[in-house]
């Protein structure tokens, strides 16, 4: 028997600038110790961001959510079949729009590309690569797309699982302690 109310819509809106995206950002690679991994088998952050906000804003939210110390180059990879898939659309910093050492043309600039313009769908994963020297790899999964953005400040972290690894590990320091 019905309740007289319309059926509740799942959070699978069509997306766009007026939508709110809930994203899970999972750390999947980087310079971490075995001890850290055993103590933190899953390190992820859930972030909500408005569709009108840019990939640059998402980067800053991830940067703060994972307690990073220093800025580095980064890019987002949308589509393809995994990280570094040459068929993925790459969104990069302005300085990386022309790279004489990379023949793959970027799809866009992170400072101008909005979340809502990417055509994301619920359950769709995409990649975020931070610090091209240390290679911090993250998989971002779209958990929900809401057709309305409630009042509030976005982006915002709504959940944290696991500790943030240190951005830089003192690999030599571990050996020094053994010599004392």
Regions found by a protein language model. Give the residues of each.
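Short linear regulatory motifs enriched in tryptophan with gly/pro/ser
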Residues: 1-180
